[in-house]
Amino acid sequence: MLVYKKIRIYYFSGTGNAKRISYWIREFAAEKNIICNLENIDTARHNSIDIDTDTLVIIISPIHGFNYPPITLDFIRRFPKGSNDIILMNTRAGLKIGKTVTPGLTGIAFFVSTIMLKMKGYKIKGQIPFDMPSNWMSIHPALNKNTVAFLHEANFYKVKKYCDRIFEGNSVFVSYRDIVQDILISPISLGYYIAGRFAFAKSFYASTACDGCQLCVKQCPVKAIKILNKRPFWLLKCESCMRCMSLCPKRAIESAHGLFVIISIFYSTLATYLLNKLSSDFLHYPFVEKVFSFIVFFILLIFFYRIQHLFLLNKYTGRLISFFSLTHYKFWGRYRSIADAIWRQKKN
C-alpha cells in the first residue's frame, strides 16, 4: 500500500549524476500517481521552503571528500524545522570491473546530515548511496562510454528497487552495509573538509583555448569563479563539483598537475628548512608541526597559483602550463551524465 502521495526532492549535482537519480525517482513516482517535485539546491531559497507535513522529503547530493559538499551541508543546516519523513541519498564515485560495479564510499555524509535533521525534528527513513560514474576528472580520466552506460543502467534498476520500498513507507538503510569502511575513512573526510578542499579549489585554470564565453562563471553553483585579467580565476570556495570542466565547450578548463609538482618541491624544501631553523620545542609537537606545514603549503599554493594566472596571459607560457596537465590531452576526456536513451540504445 502506498503511504506517500507527495514527494519533494532537493538535489545538488555538478555533472548530472544526482540530477539523473532525481529524474528516475520522479519517473517511478509518476507511475504510482505520486506527485513528485524537484528543486535544485543551487537555486533553492530557504525562506521560501514550505512543505506539507505529509510530503516525503528526499535530499540527494554527490560525495566530495567522503562527505556532502559544503553547499549541501549549508542547505541542510538552514533547512526549516519540521516533522516530515526524510530519505538521504548520495552519488559516490562508482567504477566498473568486468560486470561488477565497484562502490564508492559515503564517509561521514549521512552521519552529519542525520544529526542536523533530527535536531530539527525530522524522521530519517532511509540512507541510500548510488554508485553513479566517478567524475573526479582532476584525479583520473573520464570513464569510457560503455562503462558510463553500464553504471547508469545498473543504478536505474537500483533506484526502481528502492522506490518500490520507499513508496510503501518502508525504511531503507542501505548505508549500514558500509558502516565499517565509512568509520575508517572519517579522518580523511575531516581532513578534506578542513584543508584538502581548498587545495583542490586552486587546481583549476583556463587554458589558452578559453574564448572568454564565461559559461563557467555563470554556471558555477557557488560563484567561485571570477574574471581576473580577462581570464577565469578560481576562488577558495570552489567545491570541485566538476561542472565547469564538464560544460566548457572548448575543453579549456584543466587541472594544474604541473603546478602541484612545483609547489610540492618548494614545500618539502621550505617546510623542512623552517622547522629546522625555528628551534622552538612547541613547533615539534606532531599536531603543531602539521598545522605549520599546512600553512606553509597554503601560502605557496596561493602565491604560485597567482603567478600561474599571470603566465596564462601569454600564449607561449600558457601552452607550456597545459603541456604539464594530464587533463589537457584527449585521452583524459570529460565526464557528464548521459541521457537514458543512450544506455537503453546500447542495451538493445
Language model features with spans:
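Hydrophobic residues within alpha-helices
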Residues: 21-25, 29, 113, 216
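Short gly/ser/thr-rich secondary-structure transition/capping motifs
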Residues: 37-44
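FMN-binding flavodoxin-like domain, especially the glycine-rich phosphate-binding loop
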Residues: 2-7, 17, 30-37, 51-60, ...
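N-terminal beta1-alpha1 ligand-phosphate binding loop
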Residues: 6-25
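Hydrophobic alpha-helical transmembrane segments
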Residues: 281-299
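Short Fe-S-cluster ligation motifs
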Residues: 236-262, 271-286
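Short glycine-/small-residue-rich Rossmann-like dinucleotide-binding loops
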Residues: 62-63, 221, 249
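Ferredoxin-like iron-sulfur electron-transfer modules
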Residues: 189-219, 223-240, 253-267
